[in-house]
Amino acid sequence: MIFSAKKWNNGKELKAVMKVNTAISFDMMEAPLRNAFRQYLVPLLGDAMVGEVVEIYEFGPNPDVLEQNTEGATEREKLDSRLLEICKRANANLAFWNDFDEISMRITDAGFQRQKSDNGESFQQVYKYQEDNLRASLRNKGFNALDELLEFLYAHIAEYPEFASSQAYQDRKSAIVRSTADVNDVCFINGLSLIHISEPT
C-alpha cells in the first residue's frame, strides 16, 4: 500500500493529494485505502509495477521534500516522485468514493450510526445535492488520475519496464481501444475514462 501509519503525520500524507481535515485518522482510512489500492491500482498496473510503486513509496524520494522540478534531483527521482503522487491521488479519491457510506457511518454491535464529532462540536449534515456532487467529484478525480497514470507510464515506458511486461499492459496493447486518447481522437470526451469504460446498467 502507498499510505502508512508511519508516514500519516496526522493526515498530512493524505492532505498532500486531496482536501481533507488533518484530524482524519489512519485507522479510519486504512481499510478504504487498501481496498481502493487492490481494486483499482493493482489490476491496472500489474503485480510487478505495483511492487515498484510500493518500493518507491517506502525507499524513494519523499514527495513532501522533493518537488518534480527540484534542482539536484536526478531525472529518475523526479519521475518516481511524479509517479507516486499520481498513484496516491488516484488511490485517495477512489478510496473515499468507493467507501463513501462506510466512512461517514459507524458500524457497531448496536447497529449503524452517523458519524459525529468526538469532541462535542456540532457539524451540520450536508445537503443531498452536496453529497451527490462530492461523490461525483471523488469518482471523476480518481478515474482521471488513473488516466493520467496510464499516460505517464506510456510516455516513460523505458524507465518502467515492470509495467511494459505486465499482463495489464499487454492486454491493453492488443485491445481495439487502448486508452482514453484513442476515443478522444474520434469523439471528444474530454479525456474521461468513465465514458468509454462504463458498463451498461
Which stretches of residues belong to each language-model region?
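Low-complexity intrinsically disordered segments
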Residues: 1-24, 148-194
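N-terminal interaction modules that seed assembly of large macromolecular complexes
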Residues: 11-72
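Structured alpha-helical bundle/scaffold domains in large eukaryotic membrane-trafficking regulators
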Residues: 48, 52, 103, 107-115
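Short, mixed-charge amphipathic alpha-helical segments
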Residues: 59-63, 71-89
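Elongated alpha-helical scaffolds
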Residues: 82-109
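Conserved binding-pocket/active-site segment within a compact domain
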Residues: 108-169
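Residue-level detector of conserved catalytic or cofactor/ligand-binding positions
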Residues: 193-201
